[in-house]
Every structure is written in structure tokens, then in C-alpha cells.
Amino acid sequence: MDPSTLLLFVIIAAGLIVLSIFFTFVPVMLWISALAAGVRVSIFTLVGMRLRRVIPNRVVNPLIKAHKAGLDVTINQLESHYLAGGNVDRVVNALIAAQRANIELNFARCAAIDLAGRDVLEAVQMSVNPKVIETPFISGVAMDGIEVKAKARITVRANIERLVGGAGEETIIARVGEGIVSTIGSSNNHKRVLENPDMISQTVLGKGLDSGTAFEILSIDIADVDIGKNIGAILQTDQAEADKNIAQAKAEERRAMAVAQEQEMRAKVEEMRAKVVEAEAEVPLAMAEALREGNIGVMDYMNIKNIDADTDMRDSFGKMTKGPSDNENK
């Protein structure tokens, strides 16, 4: 091969390599698009984005969109927001929507809301078109013990000034639920709640439940009211059952005490019988001592023995006459 031809191929290959590297690091088509849209962006700025690991499309395209919408936004602002982890395209869309709706919102405020984790575009849309939040059935018990269940629809509008640091939808639902329970609980009769469901919405709406939240409550409407259980009757039944169990326990305790007392009295009777037997065992000793000392004579002793014999005989007769009658009764 001719050396000049070989050199030409080498030059062409080197040129292709240089061009591929150039188009890799320099988004020429994006730069041309920006120039065609009237956005002046330096080619070196795009190269610097590549070096800073910033995707140029994520910054330049929103910049073109903002320029066409007449927003005063610089490429440095968009790039810094991208580097901070924000969604540049959503911020620009929110600024455009706010401008069209005559809502005062600057780039710094919008970027802060986006970095706080809020959907700033949705917030702007909610400022124009309020959102309806539907609560689940919330139960409350009136003073007559009847459970009343109510479901509410809350119409809210986003408050852009309080999006950063303001509470979300869960707080709104919790506060409205608390107000519904309080209103139902303060009613003397559940029929009053059924007849005037707007009483709940008026009472709850007048409490200023949107303070400290990212929303402004426009209206609270009671969508449905239903009757639940008779909580008062259930509580009374449970209380009666508990009282019955307590009374039964006390009766069982008294019965056990009576049985114990009966056993104790039987033990005392046996103890007294033992003492009687012990005393009877000492009688012959006492009589022998009396005879020895001459306190009683032989005739006195014989009379005592005769009396004992008569007593034993009467006892035996009594047992004989008592036995047949007991058998007949049995």
C-alpha cells in the first residue's frame, strides 16, 4: 500500500475518533436547540456540566421551556437545584403554572418546596383546583349511648406559604375526625345528629383545624351518617356480668369461711370431749385419794357404785328401746 494512502487512512481514523470524543463530551445538538430557541448557552458551559456529572438535557431543556414562558431563570440556578437533588423540570412546570394562574411564586421558594419533598406542581394545581379528601367512617357515641358513624368530605386548597414545615393530609383527617367525635359525644341524643348532620360540619369548621397545616380548609361536608351499636347497653350488660361474677366470688368466699368455721367448731368439740374424758379418768384417782385420807367412807363409795350401775342400766335400756324405733323410721 502506498505510504501516502496509509497516512490518509490514519488521519481519517484519528479524525473520527476525535469527533466521536468531541460529540460525546459536547452536546452539540442540544446547544443548537438552545440557540434556535433564543437561549444563549456557551458550549463551554455544557462541557463543564459533563465534567460536573450533570446531564445537560436535564437543565437545558427546562431552561428553554422557562425562556419560552417568559420566566427569569438562569442556567446556574437550574444547575444548582439539580446538584442539590431537586427535580428541575417539575420546578419549572410549577413556575409556569403559577404564572398562568397569577400566583406569586419565585424560583427560590419553589426550589425550597421541591427540596423539602413536596410535589410543588401538585401544590400549585391544588391552589387553582381544590382537592377533596374523603375520610373513612368515624365513630362517636352520643350521651344516650348510641354509636353514630359519620363520613366527611373535606375540600382543601394548598397554602403555598406553609408547604415547607406544614402538616399534611393525615393531620387534616385526624383533626376533622377528632372534631366529629367531639361533636357527636356532646349531643344529648343520637336523633339530633341524624336530623341535623350539618351541625357536625359547622362545629368542626369553626374550630380552625387548618392551622399549622399546608392546606386551607374551604368546606367540610357530611357525606353519610349511620347508626352503630348500642354502646350504653353493651357497657351496662358487661357491668352487670362483672357485678354478678363479683357477687358469686363473694358468696363462694363466705361459703368457704362457713365451712372452715364449721370444721373449727368440730375440732373444738372434740377437744372439749377429750378434756371431759381426761377429767373422768381422774375421778377414780380422786375417790381413791378421798378413801385413803378418810374424806368418804366405804358406804359412801358403795352408794356411788350403785348409782353408776343404775345409770349404766338406764343407758342400756334406753339404747334397747331406741334401736327398734330407729330401724322402723329408716
Swiss-Prot record:
The chain crosses the membrane at residues 6-26, 28-48. One of its GO terms (cellular component) is membrane raft. Keywords: Cell membrane, Membrane, Transmembrane, Transmembrane helix. It is a multi-pass membrane protein. It is found in: Cell membrane; Membrane raft. Its main location: membrane. It comes from the Bacteria. Belongs to the flotillin-like FloA family. Homooligomerizes. NCBIfam families: PRK13665.1 (NF010186). Found in functional membrane microdomains (FMM) that may be equivalent to eukaryotic membrane rafts. FMMs are highly dynamic and increase in number as cells age. Flotillins are thought to be important factors in membrane fluidity. This is Flotillin-like protein FloA.
